[in-house]
Amino acid sequence: PQRLRPLIPEIRARMSELLGEAVEVVRARFGGRLSYASVPLDGVDWGPFDIIATDAGYRTAAMAARFGDDIRAFVAQGKAQGKPVAVTEFGCAAFRGAADMANRGDIVEWGDGARPVGFKGEYVRDEEEQARYIRELLDVFESEGVDNVFVYTFARYDLAYRSASEDFDLASAGLVQVIQGGRGQRYPDMRWEPKAAFHALAEFYRALDASQR
């Protein structure tokens, strides 16, 4: 909101102070590399960190035209500071139109206990759209030189497939379809079934690995 804009500099300063203190505490106990999954509003001072990271890896229809430029600028930020960069969150759900909405695609009506009870409209399951979106973004990240990426997410156990009329998984960004009260076909000992996005991710990295040998 507009009324909060004057507070942003103070919020960012306090955020950086808090993160700096947190880094000191963690480094006293942990010898590995550190990062923080940020959003643009945070305005993080990356000095204390080893990896520059963002959760803002989503491409919506509203900003698709500038998405490549945004990722290029993010990579340039890392190069300027001599640090690798990571996109710590990207993906979309498995319904038609989800790619345009990306992380803004909450189509579920929630009931008591954070339990899905219905949808906000009529939606059609479309695993190929989810898979295509992930492939397209992986191509962008790879071509622009992003060092590490993390798909959101492997599974949403709160958005399980119950029946054809209660297919809440179509609203899930999970790479697998969680099956309530059942087991998968490909992996019968698991409560989930790989979606098209699962295979798209595997195929991308299989091909990338082969090209780098």
Functional labels for PLM-detected ranges:
Residues P1-E21, V25, V39, A99-D100, ...:
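Polysaccharide-binding and catalytic clefts of secreted carbohydrate-active enzymes
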Residues P9, A13, E21-E24, A28, ...:
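Glycoside hydrolase catalytic-domain groove-lining segments
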Residues A13, E17, A65, D69, ...:
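Generic alpha-helical secondary structure signal
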Residues G121-R125, A131:
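A conserved mid-domain beta-alpha-beta active-site/ligand-binding segment of alpha/beta enzyme cores
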Residues E129-R132, V140, E144, F150-R213:
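Aromatic-rich peripheral "rim/lid" segments of glycoside hydrolase catalytic domains that contact
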